[in-house]
């Protein structure tokens, strides 16, 4: 081992014995952001009912720190788009996204929000909200269960805590 590297490690160990933690500010901020999402709901169809069920006592989303659903996009950092998005609704979706402060993330909940679902061939439907806003996490299902929303939020938490890693965790690992 290099002498300079060994000296650096000894200094770090000495600081740790004095209860001094060395890390970058970005890691601390990302940890805080990942454990305290404030989602704004954009419920458009049946997926919104499952999103409301995720806030209920059976799923208990509050144990992860996500129970504070915001009515105003100016106080939120995660937008959950749940359900079908029509072409007439697209400008409103973009306006709400633009009102959110940085950093901000988007979750597309359900088949309709992700790829149009069974209405993909309709003239009035968008084939995915990623054509309007950048989507960070896709939750499949029609409609997805509340547990899937919790899993999607945990995937987003992992993505926020580890911005250098592109790959998300597999279920159960």
UniProtKB/Swiss-Prot annotation:
> What GO molecular functions are on record for this protein?
4 iron, 4 sulfur cluster binding; iron ion binding; NADH dehydrogenase (ubiquinone) activity; NADH:ubiquinone reductase (non-electrogenic) activity; quinone binding
Q: What does the Swiss-Prot or TrEMBL cofactor note state?
A: Binds 1 [4Fe-4S] cluster.
GO cellular component, alphabetical, reads: plasma membrane; respiratory chain complex I
Question: Gene3D superfamilies in the record, alphabetically?
Answer: 3.40.50.12280
Where does the record place it?
Answer: Cell membrane
Database matches in InterPro entries = NADH_UbQ_OxRdtase-like_20kDa, NADH_UQ_OxRdtase_20Kd_su
Keyword annotations of the record: 4Fe-4S, Cell membrane, Iron, Iron-sulfur, Membrane, Metal-binding, NAD, Quinone, Translocase, Transport
Names of required cofactors: [4Fe-4S] cluster
Q: Name one GO biological process term.
A: electron transport coupled proton transport
Major place of residence: membrane
Membrane topology type? Peripheral membrane protein
Its EC number is: 7.1.1.-
Broad EC category: translocase
Question: PROSITE patterns under this entry?
Answer: COMPLEX1_20K (PS01150)
Residues reported to bind [4Fe-4S] cluster: 46-47, 112, 142
Q: What reaction does this catalyse?
A: a quinone + NADH + 5 H(+)(in) = a quinol + NAD(+) + 4 H(+)(out)
Record-stated family: Belongs to the complex I 20 kDa subunit family.
Self-association state and partner proteins as the record states? NDH-1 is composed of 14 different subunits. Subunits NuoB, C, D, E, F, and G constitute the peripheral sector of the complex.
Listed PANTHER family: NADH DEHYDROGENASE (PTHR11995), NADH DEHYDROGENASE [UBIQUINONE] IRON-SULFUR PROTEIN 7, MITOCHONDRIAL (PTHR11995:SF14)
Q: What does this protein do?
A: NDH-1 shuttles electrons from NADH, via FMN and iron-sulfur (Fe-S) centers, to quinones in the respiratory chain. The immediate electron acceptor for the enzyme in this species is believed to be a menaquinone. Couples the redox reaction to proton translocation (for every two electrons transferred, four hydrogen ions are translocated across the cytoplasmic membrane), and thus conserves the redox energy in a proton gradient.
Identification of the protein by name:
NADH-quinone oxidoreductase subunit B
Q: Which organism is it from?
A: Desulfitobacterium hafniense (strain Y51)
């Amino acid at each position: 081992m290099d002498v300079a590297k060994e000296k650096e490690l000894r200094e770090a160990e000495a600081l740790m014995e004095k209860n001094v933690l060395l890390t970058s500010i970005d890691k601390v901020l990302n940890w805080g952001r990942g454990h305290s999402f404030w989602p704004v709901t954009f419920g458009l169809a049946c997926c919104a009912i499952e999103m409301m069920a995720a806030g209920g006592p059976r799923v208990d989303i509050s144990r992860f720190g996500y129970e504070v659903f915001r009515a105003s996009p100016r106080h939120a950092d995660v937008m959950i788009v749940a359900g079908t998005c029509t072409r007439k609704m697209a400008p409103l979706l973009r306006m709400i996204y633009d009102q959110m402060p940085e950093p901000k993330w988007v979750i597309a909940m359900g088949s309709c929000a992700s790829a149009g679902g069974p209405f993909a061939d309709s003239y009035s439907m968008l084939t995915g909200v990623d054509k309007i806003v950048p989507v960070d996490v896709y939750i499949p299902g029609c409609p997805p269960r509340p547990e899937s929303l919790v899993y999607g939020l945990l995937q987003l938490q992992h993505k926020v805590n580890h911005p250098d890693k592109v790959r998300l965790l597999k279920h159960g690992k």
